[in-house]
Design a protein with these regions (language model features):
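Helix-coil boundary and interhelical linker segments in multi-pass alpha-helical membrane proteins
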Residues: 556-565, 630-650
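Membrane-water interface at loop-to-transmembrane-helix junctions
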Residues: 600-619, 645-653
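Generic alpha-helical transmembrane segments
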Residues: 576, 622, 652-667
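Transmembrane alpha-helix/helix-exit interface in multi-pass inner-membrane proteins
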Residues: 622-630
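A C-terminal functional module that forms or caps the active site or interfaces directly
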Residues: 670
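Conserved cytosolic headpiece of P-type ATPases
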Residues: 1, 5-598, 602-606, 619, ...
Length: 744
């Protein structure tokens, strides 16, 4: 087998002869090739541990070597089969679904109580007012009138626009998120991303770049350079030959081909700096690929009229044979400060760097002493620069980030420190073996301080998700391999990587197209924006409900059984529900949302602050509607006595107009928690269009509604009075917000 996919239907094959190097990235996401050979010791291996040395798994790619293998497992007993069974199960209820179910019960209770109160109010007003029906039909008509209004209130209490809002939010946010390399294919993923309290993230490709790259070049006197462009020209030429020609990969037609991951990283280091990596390739006399026994590779070339051999390999072996080194200006100097150089190498190893030494000598052999050190290169799958900032911002948002990797503990800890995950003495890093020694109860105690899990197995991810969810945490999981799919499915929100397998993408809720942690942060921000928009809509809609119930309940006590007709209430319900969904579905994603703590899974979607806003606004609208209908001063101002007889139809028309306009203006209050109701208004043009449409519709309803809506046209004076009363809801709420903010 050479550079081929390992099998079609098998789970694992045991090597019986030979040695191969295998890329297992499709299963564990790690870029480092795994060596597989015969189990000569007869030692028993955990067959589900992808790091074992004698089993080759389906879906992996053989990069080099030859081997005979014995098929061990097929069918639904395979890893693929087991994963497929686990992925099929999907019984999750999202945090938002839990909150909305709780809210639905509360709204239903409020609606039923309000409906009963209205029926009681109508009958009480009739009986106490002395207008007791004389005939059976009068009783029937009174009952029908009261029950009709009550049923209408129940209908109005249900926020029918909420499903439309979530659909609009998903489509609108999805378009914006696609531009940020985030693809949403399950709506519950976007809902839940905003409530995350714990995120398990892969290391390779997510926190790191996902490929090896040269981080630093150091000379024998430890002069350090971070790129080829920084190297002085004499040293630059030597490094170019030392790693460009002594390399199994090559650069052709804009692509780096061949070689292992280390050789490709060295070639990329040259290409990215605009260096011609193929320079003087025609001068190559002999090339010896990496020898595992000698721990180095060599290339012999004709250089400046003489034969020179360049050596690249394990730095400790190469430096031990060096007597001199090239300084930054290309001058040959005695290598006397070996301890200084070795200290530097130890420091880099502590940062999980893979070190390579490059040396040269005259002649066509490199077996002797007296080498000249060209440089030492530090290579690593480097931390993404943007990931460090993104991790910090996610942590500031109250979300715990845990890096889960198949890499060794030392490497994982070094990366975690650089990424900002390990900052305190209380932070914990565990290996898979250490994790397995903990009981579930012990793991739950450690979990709040857990930051790194190394040598992780697929079962570790699923267990971490389960224990975190038992602590009532909202859990996110990233993954790219087939073995990640159960954990992606079990997590509250699964982030599949764009470069990952189709199985992982199918199991996840959101696909991160560029595999970047920064994009995960953006997904969380958009999720929080969606949740905020739902809350804004609920403030708006619940205010309508409270105002409608209170107005219809109190009006009969003042002598008006039907201050808002059934048709008017249905018009309000239809217009406010549907158009409000459009208005709040386009709210901008504000970074201030990332400064807030996550919302608990079982927390109510309606907070006390929201209820205070709903109650104050609802009471104001109710009070103004009752004042318009029953206060003589306002009646005269509206022109209801212009004929000498009280025009109740005109007053009810003014009530209807004021009710709808006040609700419309309350949208400005609902869309922000701050005292300025007009902030960021330019970033949601749909909101302005909807409010404008509602005001125009209200004018048309009252002017042309006639007998259908039980209204009559208002004078311009009456319209101005109604408009002023309705607009006052904005300063009223500004005062409320100022008072409540001082109490914090």
């Amino acid at each position: 087998l050479l550079a081929s996919s390992a099998a079609s239907d098998v789970y694992k094959r045991q090597i019986v002869e030979g040695l191969v190097k295998v890329d297992q990235a499709t299963l564990n996401g790690e870029t480092k090739e795994a060596t597989k050979t015969v189990n000569e010791s007869g030692e028993a291996y955990n067959t589900k541990d992808l790091l074992n040395r004698c089993y080759v798994y389906r879906g992996t790619v053989v990069c080099s070597g030859e081997a005979y293998m014995e098929v061990k497992v097929v069918g639904d007993k395979t890893l693929f089969g087991e994963l497929a069974l686990e992925v099929q199960e999907d019984t999750r209820e999202t945090p938002l679904q839990v909150k909305l179910a709780k809210l639905a019960k509360q709204i239903s209770t409020f609606g039923y109580i309000g409906a009963i109160a209205i029926v009681v109010g109508v009958f009480a007003r009739t009986l106490l007012g002395g207008n007791i029906p004389n005939t059976f039909m009068e009783w029937v008509n009174l009952s029908i009138e009261a029950i009709t209004v009550a049923v209408t209130i129940i209908v109005c209490a249900v926020p029918e626009g909420l499903p439309m809002l979530t659909s609009i939010l998903l489509s609108y946010q999805s378009m914006r998120m696609a531009k940020d390399n985030v693809l949403v294919h399950k709506i519950n993923g976007l809902e839940t991303a905003g409530s995350l309290s714990l995120l398990f993230s892969d290391k390779t490709g997510t926190i790191t770049e996902g490929k090896l790259s040269v981080v630093e070049v150091a000379t024998g006197n430890v002069r350090k350079f971070s790129s080829m462009k920084e190297l002085p020209l004499p040293l630059k030429d030597e490094v170019t030959i030392g790693i460009g020609l002594n390399n199994s990969s090559s650069y052709s037609n804009g692509s780096i081909i061949g070689g292992n991951s280390t050789d490709r990283a060295l070639m990329s280091f040259l290409v990215d700096a605009g260096v011609d990596a193929n320079v003087a390739r025609e001068d190559v006399r002999n090339f010896n690929a990496f020898d595992s026994a000698k721990k180095y590779s060599t290339v012999t070339i004709n250089h400046n009229g003489k034969v020179v051999t360049y050596i690249k390999g394990a730095p400790e072996r190469i430096i031990a044979r060096c007597q001199t080194y090239l300084d930054e200006n290309g001058a040959v100097k005695p290598l006397t400060e070996r301890n200084f150089l070795m200290t530097y190498m130890d420091e880099q190893a502590g940062r999980s760097m893979r070190l390579l030494g490059v040396a040269k000598c005259d002649g066509d052999t490199a077996d002797g002493e007296g080498l000249t050190l060209v440089c030492v290169l530090a290579i690593r799958d480097n931390v993404r620069k943007e990931a460090v900032d993104a991790i910090r911002e996610v942590q500031e948002a109250g979300i715990q980030v845990v890096m889960v990797t198949g890499d060794r503990k030392e490497t994982a800890v070094a990366i975690a420190k650089e990424a900002g995950l390990l900052k305190h003495n209380t932070d914990v890093a565990l290996t898979s073996a250490e994790l397995a020694e903990l009981s579930d109860d012990e793991l739950k105690k450690v979990l709040p301080n857990l930051r790194v899990v190394s040598r992780a197995l697929p079962t570790d991810k699923s267990r971490l998700v389960r224990c975190a969810q038992e602590l009532n945490l909202v859990v996110g999981m990233t993954g790219d391999g087939v073995n990640d799919s159960p954990a992606l499915k079990k997590a509250d929100v699964g982030f599949a990587m764009g470069s990952g397998t189709e199985v992982a993408k199918e199991a996840g809720d959101i696909t991160i197209l560029d595999d970047n942690f920064l994009s995960i942060e953006k997904a969380i921000l958009y999720g929080r924006t969606m949740f905020k928009s739902i809350r804004k809509f609920l403030i708006f809609q619940l205010t309508v409900n409270v105002a409608a119930v209170l107005t219809c309940f109190l009006a009969p006590l003042f002598g008006e059984n039907e201050i808002l007709t059934v048709i008017q209430l249905l018009v309000v319900n239809l217009a406010m529900d549907t158009l409000a969904a459009i208005a709040f579905g386009s709210e901008p994603a504000l970074m201030e949302y990332m400064k807030e703590k996550p919302i608990a899974r079982d927390a109510s979607i309606v907070t006390g602050k929201m209820m205070s806003q709903v109650v104050v606004s609802g009471l104001y609208i109710t009070a103004m509607c009752l004042c318009i209908r029953f206060v003589p001063a306002l009646q005269h101002l509206l022109g209801a006595w212009s004929t000498g007889v009280l025009d109740t139809t005109l007053l009810n028309s003014a009530v209807f107009a004021t009710f709808m306009m006040a609700i419309s203006f309350n949208g400005f209050n609902a869309r922000t928690e701050h005292t300025n109701p007009f902030e960021h208004l330019g970033r949601n043009k749909n909101f302005l269009l909807v409010i404008g449409a509602l005001l125009v519709l209200q004018f048309l309803f009252v002017t042309f509604g006639g007998a259908v809506l039980s209204v009559e046209p208002l004078s311009w004076t009456a319209w101005l009075v109604c408009l002023l009363i309705a607009f006052l809801i904005i300063p009223i709420d500004i005062i409320r917000k100022a008072i409540t903010s001082k109490k914090k």
